[in-house]
């Protein structure tokens, strides 16, 4: 048993997984010792959890990515969010970029990827626990996470991302993933800049707070792609436009 040579089992798929991690190697070492001492133990496998630190940036992941989930027979749905890692007014506050992946039919959490200068490990470890317990998204919707401005946001960044994914799965939000956009699924869509201030050169700017009906020169059957910095204003604009028949 060694972190250098470690061919384990992925606990989601049941398939062989290369996971040369010191953490799982130590767990396996403990289990081996217990087996040698006469206790029967069964190792459930790994999730491929990993984390690293770069200059000014922490990156972590656990579970299945979209491609791996699809190859394992799941129908994955994902969202990417940019969320505050603590109260925005607190010194040292920054952001997480989070990708959350779930199975479409069961809505079970399959994977999480997170990067940012803050406590990425906490985001990953929450996902590890959820995936290991077979949790679906709705069962985590109202978890009572620890909150104080130095540590988190009032709606935890994990819960925030989960809510966005639930909105997408339940049909309350329509969005493209970057991969879908690259594949051309937004071909023929009219791009509208809905940021706080105009940011996209050559694109029409729309302030959602000023929308009080059908947009001039944009019929309700037009395919429109709403773009902003973090997704929040695009979501609010989408809701406003749906109200007016789009």
Please report, for each region that a protein language model flagged, where it lies by residue.
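Mid-to-C-terminal Rossmann-like scaffold of FAD/NAD(P)H-dependent oxidoreductases
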Residues: 4-118, 153, 157-184, 189
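Short phosphate-binding/catalytic loops that engage adenosine nucleotides
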Residues: 74, 135, 245-246
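Conserved beta-strand scaffold positions in the cores of enzyme catalytic domains, especially
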Residues: 76-78, 191, 203-208
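A short, polar/charged loop-to-alpha-helix boundary motif
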Residues: 117-136
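Generic hydrophobic alpha-helical segments
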Residues: 127-128, 181, 224
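Catalytic P-loop NTP-binding/switch module of NTPases
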Residues: 137-143
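Short, polar loop motifs at secondary-structure junctions
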Residues: 193-199
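Catalytic cysteine-centered active loop of the rhodanese-like fold, especially the PTP/DSP P-loop
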Residues: 211-246
């Amino acid at each position: 048993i060694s972190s250098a040579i470690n061919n384990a089992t992925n606990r989601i798929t049941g398939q062989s997984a290369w996971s040369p991690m010191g953490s799982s190697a130590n767990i396996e070492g403990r289990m081996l010792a217990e087996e040698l001492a006469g206790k029967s133990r069964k190792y459930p496998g790994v999730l491929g959890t990993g984390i690293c630190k770069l200059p000014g940036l922490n990156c972590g992941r656990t579970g299945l990515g979209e491609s791996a989930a699809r190859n394992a027979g799941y129908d994955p749905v994902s969202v990417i969010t940019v969320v505050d890692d603590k109260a925005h007014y607190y010194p040292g506050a920054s952001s997480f970029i989070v990708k959350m992946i779930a199975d479409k039919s069961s809505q079970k959490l399959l994977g999480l990827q997170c990067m940012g200068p803050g406590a990425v490990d906490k985001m990953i470890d929450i996902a590890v626990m959820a995936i290991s317990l077979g949790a679906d998204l709705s069962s985590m919707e109202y978890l009572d996470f620890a909150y104080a401005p130095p540590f988190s946001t009032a709606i935890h960044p994990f819960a925030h991302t989960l809510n966005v994914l639930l909105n997408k799965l339940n049909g309350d939000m329509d969005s493209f993933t970057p991969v879908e956009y690259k594949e051309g699924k937004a071909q023929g869509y009219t791009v509208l800049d809905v940021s706080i201030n105009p940011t996209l050169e050559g694109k029409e700017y729309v302030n959602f707070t000023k929308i009080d009906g059908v947009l001039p020169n944009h019929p309700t059957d037009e395919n429109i792609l709403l773009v902003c910095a973090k997704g929040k204003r695009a979501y609010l604009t989408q809701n406003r436009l749906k109200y007016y028949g789009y």
